[in-house]
Amino acid sequence: MTVVERELSEPWEAVCCEPDGGSEAGVVVLAGSSGRVLRERARILAQQGMSALAIRWFGGPGQPAAIREVPLETFTAAVDYLKARGARRVGVMGTSKGAEAALLTAIRDPRIDVVVGNSPTALVWGGVGPGPDGSFTPYRSSWSWQGEPVPFMPYDDSWWDTAPARPRAIRGLYELSERTFAEHVDAAAIPVEQARADLLLVAGGEDRMWPSMTYTLRLAERRRAAGRTVRLISHGDAGHGLLFPGETAGPASAEFDYGGSEVADTLLGKQAWPHVLSALRGD
């Protein structure tokens, strides 16, 4: 299949990969806190017959420098783009913080037909990175909608006093923060049952960045309690960064321990891939 790539610079840095002639199935592709444009993932989705738009959602021109009150309108604009190119079914595939964004956007934009959440969270978390003054505190929400911050979980910074050496597994930061600020949990919970979109969640049991398997089960419980469907794909030995068929593993991080292994992460990606394609196509 011939794939056409279009580089975009407005309203965000992005690449749109699609079959020659376009497609009625479109998907917005979101990275996590790396801030990268996931070109390789967009390409493999386009090779499967979809219009895949991978965007940079922070750190670019005119965008927040860090993940602090990033407007969810950033992602609805991506839906606009795919709709304008003829997509009749639109999905959003996000990983980690990108999955958080995908879920929150689908709750607010009924045009989104499906969300694929890879290593997701069930809670809205505080921002990642410093504010304009260079300070990490006071914590602000990662997201805003219509100019207002989305309620969020703050972090318990005491965790850093006993943090492991680099590369760090920071899952414990999230687990401690949830216990410390338990009174924030209800307001920060992602009401995924409100999304019209179909939902597919993919998680590894050895995720050391945050407890994505636990979060996946919570999201599923909310959906099912509301009489909504959800599909779960998991692998007990996989970590935070699954690899789909056709993707290459990046270099190991010197800063973070993502858990899992290349073998297990690849197995999870292979296991999930047919379900991902089915969900995005609406099969």
Predicted segments, located by residue:
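C-terminal catalytic histidine-bearing segment of alpha/beta-hydrolase fold enzymes
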Residues: 217, 226-283
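Active-site glycine-rich loops that stabilize anionic/oxyanionic intermediates
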Residues: 24, 31-36, 205
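Catalytic nucleophile-loop/oxyanion-hole region of alpha/beta-hydrolase
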Residues: 34, 58-91
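Serine-hydrolase catalytic core
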Residues: 160-241
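Primarily recognizes the serine-hydrolase "nucleophile elbow" in alpha/beta-hydrolase
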Residues: 35-36, 40, 80-154, 171-183
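The serine-hydrolase catalytic nucleophile loop
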Residues: 32-44, 57, 213
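N-terminal cap/lid segment of alpha/beta-hydrolase-fold proteins
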Residues: 1-25
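Conserved alpha/beta-hydrolase
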Residues: 46-62
